[in-house]
Amino acid sequence: MAKSVPAIFLDRDGTINVDHGYVHEIDAFEFIDGVIDAMRELKKMGYALVVVTNQSGIARGKFTEAQFETLTEWMDWSLADRDVDLDGIYYCPHHPQGSIEEFRQVCDCRKPHPGMLISARDFLHIDMAASYMVGDKLEDMQAAAAANVGTKVLVRTGKPVTAEAENAADWVLNSLADLPSAIKKQQK
């Protein structure tokens, strides 16, 4: 049995990059200040980095799965060029009211459902209790709770934070950039 590892689960839009709405082109992808350094530091601290992102724009016909994959590959390489290696990238292309029939469905992977986190747990042998979920929406916190992630972290870099999302979170930080120091402070 492989040894389990702690992970940082990361929402993408509004957590890693500025959420301009249905971001699917390299020109529109803008890393949030400080997140690359934070991700590098989290890797040094021994955490696996796993992106878990709802991409309903695919189901809604805003962009294709191929366009999403091209952007994801670019993001992955951009991070690798800065010494940040992602351990996994999971995405949900579905939406119950999608205009693209192939992706119009109720699924287990779309947050707030925990499917992407459970898949990552099983494939990467993740210690969920020692892990963190970082996102900007209530659905991120709900998915983390359903997957038994130890610490739910809401960030203020995406959509306006709701009281409901704050109540569902264990921590509320201004940005992913603040997470390494927050974890170190907690571990003292």
UniProtKB/Swiss-Prot annotation:
The record marks 110 as: Contributes to substrate recognition. CDD domains: HAD_HisB-N. Its main location: cytoplasm. Transmembrane segments: none annotated. One of its GO terms (molecular function) is D-glycero-beta-D-manno-heptose 1,7-bisphosphate 7-phosphatase activity. This is D-glycero-beta-D-manno-heptose-1,7-bisphosphate 7-phosphatase. Zn(2+) binds at residues 92, 94, 107, 109. Monomer. Keywords: Carbohydrate metabolism, Cytoplasm, Hydrolase, Lipopolysaccharide biosynthesis, Magnesium, Metal-binding, Zinc. The keyword Hydrolase applies. Belongs to the GmhB family.
